[in-house]
A protein has these predicted regions:
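N-terminal pre-domain/capping segments
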Residues: 1-110
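Active-site acidic/histidine proton-transfer and metal-coordination neighborhood
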Residues: 8, 42, 72-167
């Protein structure tokens, strides 16, 4: 419920909210390669945003996932010149997907990796697989300097996902 006190808090914080440009807003243009990853940095900078959130596959042939180390470094350098943060996103939580996203994040100087589990089957089995994925991220990348965000993209209830993260 919005109360007068809550409204005041919101107004006090509005100028410091960390707003990011999300590549999904440009999804079709990125699929058609009319907007490329580096373009997102320009758009975010022009709009005084904190940074960009970009999927490893956004931009098709020109996506971060298809860039070599030199190109990834150049992307990160441009973001730093523009004083922008980078959040890398991937659409799975299995090892290879996480490893790819983390490699890209580290090579671009990103601060965060967002992922979500995409499994189907018996709930008990799915929960077990997701728990293993989260454990892999924790054990492998806890000292990477990255922040990891798990997105609710399955038919799990919030408390189920929270309990998996807390394990």
């Amino acid at each position: 419920m919005v109360t007068i006190n809550n409204a005041r808090k919101i107004l006090q914080r509005v100028d410091t909210l960390p707003l990011y440009l999300h590549a999904y807003a440009f999804h079709l243009n990125m699929r058609l390669e009319r907007v490329l990853p580096a373009d997102l940095l320009d758009i975010a900078s022009e709009n005084n945003l904190r940074g960009v959130k970009i999927h490893v596959l956004d931009g098709e042939r020109f996506s971060l996932g298809n860039m070599d180390d030199k190109e990834l470094s150049a992307f990160g350098d441009k973001a730093r010149r523009l004083n922008l943060d980078i959040h890398i996103e991937t659409s799975a939580s299995y090892k290879a997907s996480i490893d790819e996203a983390v490699a890209i994040a580290l090579k671009t100087g990103a601060s965060s990796v967002r992922f979500y589990p995409r499994y189907e089957g018996n709930l008990r089995d799915v929960l077990s697989i997701i728990a293993n994925d989260i454990a892999y991220v924790r054990e492998t990348y806890q000292d990477s300097g990255l922040t990891f965000t798990i997105e609710q993209h399955e038919d799990l209830k919030s408390h189920e996902l929270v309990s998996l993260v807390k394990e």
